[in-house]
């Protein structure tokens, strides 16, 4: 099980990214726009750099909803491979069966 502080940090990062998503999108649009002047692009880049680091969605890490484990997490289920296997063996995941060939 991951430390509670690590899980809380990830939750905080998600909230920060959500809070600044519109502002980041607006600044990135100015930077990517061909009609923007060099001065506007420079200003937008400066403002983008001044936003909090955790406002970037790439700083987020997928974690298991049960254990908080950062590796081996299946996006579709939100569970790490260990807990997904346990849930599948109990029959908690409809349509998921153990492979057999």
From Swiss-Prot:
Gene Ontology cellular component?
A: cytoplasm; small ribosomal subunit
GO biological process entries: translation
Q: Name one GO molecular function term.
A: rRNA binding
Question: SUPFAM superfamilies, per this entry?
Answer: Glucocorticoid receptor-like (DNA-binding domain)
- Keywords of this protein's UniProt record, alphabetized? Ribonucleoprotein, Ribosomal protein, RNA-binding, rRNA-binding
Q: Which InterPro entries match?
A: Ribosomal_uS14 (IPR001209), Ribosomal_uS14_bac/plastid (IPR023036), Ribosomal_uS14_CS (IPR018271)
Subunit note:
Part of the 30S ribosomal subunit. Contacts proteins S3 and S10.
- Family recorded in the similarity comment: Belongs to the universal ribosomal protein uS14 family.
Q: What does this protein do?
A: Binds 16S rRNA, required for the assembly of 30S particles and may also be responsible for determining the conformation of the 16S rRNA at the A site.
Protein name in the entry: Small ribosomal subunit protein uS14
Q: Which organism is it from?
A: Cellvibrio japonicus (strain Ueda107) (Pseudomonas fluorescens subsp. cellulosa)
Gene of this entry: rpsN
